[in-house]
């Protein structure tokens, strides 16, 4: 199975391709759990809005952050979408179709 990479994410989310492709280690939604090579999805919850932590996540080595708040869209390595939760669901569906699991 081909590993997940930034090009796949951008293609699935109908975003411009990054200037450099890279293999994605993990998809993460908790900013406290970020590691180098991860892609962070900034989800807004009832108590916290993960967009408040995007700059920290990128500083910790995230490959990219998928964001839906305008003030985060200009950050380096930010992938701007209309709705980060919907983008995560779209990516999950695209990955499942790519893997073609036997159920």
Identify the function of each model-found stretch.
Residues 1-90, 94:
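N-terminal leader/targeting and accessory segments in enzymes
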């Amino acid at each position: 199975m081909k590993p997940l990479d930034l090009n796949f994410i951008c293609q699935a989310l109908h975003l411009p391709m990054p200037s450099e492709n890279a293999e994605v280690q993990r998809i993460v939604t908790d900013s406290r759990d970020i590691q180098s090579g991860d892609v962070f999805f900034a989800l807004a919850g009832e108590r916290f809005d993960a967009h408040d932590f995007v700059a920290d996540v990128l500083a910790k080595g995230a490959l990219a952050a998928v964001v839906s708040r305008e003030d985060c869209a200009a950050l380096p390595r930010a992938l701007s979408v209309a709705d980060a939760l919907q983008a995560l669901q779209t990516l999950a569906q695209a990955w499942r179709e790519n893997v073609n699991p036997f159920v």
